[in-house]
Amino acid sequence: YSKGCDSRELFMNYNIAQTEDFEKYLNKYDVIHLDMQWILMDAGAPERISGYINKNVISELADLYKDIDLRDQKTLYGALSVINSMTNNKFVIIIDEWDVLIRYEAANSSVQEEYINFLRGMFKGSEPTKYIELAFLTGILPIKKLKTQSALNNFDEYTMLYAGRLSPYIGFTEDEVRDICDRYGRDFTQVERWYDGYMLGDYHVYNPRAVVNYMLHG
């Protein structure tokens, strides 16, 4: 998705390049990637996370959009809204381990509430759809509920138990493993016996790391 590089050659030899939407989304967006594990360490304390994200990402956006005055913006979603109103640009947001604070600060309700409110400001309701093209969050826990309301009720959740349409992409499918075995001269029946994998919907899926290790090291 990122405008920050030309990734066409990276994907040209893969199946994704044959899909009808490949050109539509390729390198069309500014991508904001937040790794919450690293941010927690850099921020210095759990209660500083929201402020740390707002301050640092707005600073980077100000460097990127020099013609737009973001000095009065205190929140990331406010800055994104201003940029969109001036340019019509939309963003892709990726948050790795979104639930770090929920897991690490399970007993600290004030920190959790502040963080959930930050996420709600970013994603809840119809306003964010004006400036966010796609938001993708990874984590262990399901979407957190704050009191009686879901903090992020406009997300689709995919898990190992309910992978839905993402089933063939969460691991190597059986057809992909057969193809890899052919390329590396390995016996598929051996892989099938040792790394039986798991069923996601209609797909028999194998752990990519286990398969790759076997191909490289036997």
What would you call each of these model-derived segments?
Residues 1-218:
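Phosphate-binding site recognition
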